[in-house]
A protein has these predicted regions:
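Helix-loop junctions at membrane interfaces in 12-TM secondary transporters
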Residues: 10-11, 96-106
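Extracytoplasmic
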Residues: 12-46
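Residue-level signature of mid-helix packing/kink "hotspots" within the transmembrane helices
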Residues: 29, 57-65, 149-150
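Conserved MFS/SLC helix-loop-helix module at the cytosolic interface between two early adjacent transmembrane helices
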Residues: 62-101
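MFS-fold secondary transporters
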Residues: 90-95, 106, 110, 126, ...
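Helix-loop-helix hairpin linking two adjacent transmembrane segments in secondary transporters
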Residues: 98, 102, 139-184
Length: 220
């Protein structure tokens, strides 16, 4: 591989990982300007609409707990494909939700599946980079993760000048579809000989151990 091709590949990789990192904050904050107008259309209360944020946050937390162990066992590519495909579907569910109950379901699934990409993006970074390069790559991903929540409401507000909140979720579905294509083209970065056994079962045992540890809970 020539230096030019290596640089090009590295740029493509960084863009892909950055997009994976951005999907969760974008899905969280892009529709925030629409919160005041959503209760009337869905015939519900403002507090129920605000629950869509909390439900997604719970999904994100759950997905981050198990996304990493799954990718360590199965590799990076298959969980990425599955997560992004389900994120497309969940975004469509949100876009066409006829009721608050369906919207809450879609938001939970959106958080659960979108967070898988965020976790795996960091794992892929560790697969490809080491030392100072890894530090720089993590810094870039953290910058994207920090900028997305700031920019997303501004973009969402501008979109609402021309369209409805449902289109915002359609845009998120398109964004996830682009990530799905990227996942299909992505070359597996974790060889079979480097994968671990146990996966979710081992992770669950570790989480239970931490929950039972009074010293750990005392520091949280």
């Amino acid at each position: 591989m020539t230096q030019e091709n290596s640089a090009k590949f590295s740029f493509i990789l960084v863009v892909f990982l950055g997009m994976l990192t951005a999907i969760t904050p974008l899905a969280t904050d892009l529709y925030l300007p629409a919160l005041p107008i959503m209760p009337g259309e869905l015939n519900t209360t403002a507090s129920n609409i605000q629950m869509t944020i909390g439900v997604m946050t719970f999904g994100v937390a759950l997905g981050q707990l198990f996304g990493g162990p799954i990718s360590d066992t199965m590799g990076r590519k298959l969980p990425l494909i599955t997560g992004n495909l389900l994120c497309v579907i969940s975004s469509i569910i949100c876009a066409y939700a006829p009721s608050i109950e369906i919207l809450l379901l879609g938001r939970f699934l959106q958080g659960l599946t979108g967070s898988v990409g965020v976790v795996i993006a960091k794992a892929i970074a560790r697969d490809f980079a080491f030392g100072q390069e890894l530090t720089k790559l993590f810094a870039l991903l953290m910058m994207v993760n920090g900028l997305a929540p700031v920019i997303a409401p501004l973009i969402g507000g501008q979109l609402l000048l021309f369209t409805t909140w449902r289109v915002i979720f359609v845009i998120l579905a398109i964004f996830s579809a682009i990530l799905l294509v990227g996942s299909l083209l992505f070359r597996e970065s974790l060889p079979k000989e480097k994968r671990v056994t146990g996966g979710v079962a081992t992770a669950t045992k570790n989480y239970i151990t931490l929950i039972k540890d009074k010293r750990f809970l005392g520091q949280t």
